[in-house]
Amino acid sequence: MVEKTEMSKFVGVADITENKKIWRMLLGELVGTFFLIFVGVGSTTSGSVPQIAFTFGLTVATIAQGLGHLSGCHINPAVTLGFLIVGEISILKAAFYIIVQCVGAIAGAAVIKVALDGVAGGDLGVSSFDPSLNCAQAVLIEALITFILVFVVKAVSDPGRQDIKGSAPLAVGLAIAAGHLCAIKLSGASMNPARSFGPAVVQGVWTYHWVYWVGPIAGGLLAGIIYRLIFKVRKGDDETDSYDF
């Protein structure tokens, strides 16, 4: 009976059928991803690397501050799967999150396409990597920068930590900005399958699109597992050496 209950909890039927807040949570993920794509992709039209990096990072930080209380503000399938792999979100809830994230990304890309109609360079920031790299290298880079992102998300949302005195959304946003500054000229610095999916659908460009699912998802899953097994704060842990900003 206990095993059946645990399995039911992991699948998460009750999360969808009995949770009165589920539709608000899903709407939060959809709206958050919509604005991430609309604002972030808008910066790729003629922006410099720092401009694009900080636009994406600060957009995520702002959205997380505004919508985090609803759904946790994943707005990224790699983040959602990083929570799923360690049992911190149910299968069905994760599936619904990812679906609405992709829908929001498509909507955001469609609206910005209309807004940028006729604007030079309005390719919607379709994800692509440097021609000097091969697919394996692009996947590795995406996995590594997404690992950093999801690791930071897990760290700042760890309920056992008492040492975090700064802004959790800002920390996540800076992780995204750092990933862009490091890798945008290499892999394109997607770090988010939905971010790549929306523009790909609207533009109809699917060249090596799988790279931007495999890399970020691999990095997100690995970050979730490693943080849970090694770095998660456990009862009785000594935090006397924690930083104090």
UniProtKB/Swiss-Prot annotation:
UniProt KW Repeat keyword: yes
Keywords, comma-separated and alphabetical: Membrane, Repeat, Transmembrane, Transmembrane helix, Transport
UniProt subcellular location: Membrane
Membrane topology: Multi-pass membrane protein
Molecular function via GO: water channel activity
UniProt GO BP: multicellular organismal-level water homeostasis; renal water homeostasis; transmembrane transport; water transport
Top-rank taxon: Eukaryota
Segments on the Extracellular side according to the record's topology features: 47-51, 116-132, 185-205
NPA 2 (motif): residue ranges: 192-194
InterPro entries in UniProt: Aquaporin-like, Aquaporin_transptr, MIP, MIP_CS
Self-association state and partner proteins as the record states: Homotetramer.
UniProt record similarity statement: Belongs to the MIP/aquaporin (TC 1.A.8) family.
Name the record gives this protein: Aquaporin
Species: Drosophila melanogaster
Higher taxonomy: Eukaryota, Metazoa, Ecdysozoa, Arthropoda, Hexapoda
Gene giving rise to this polypeptide: Drip
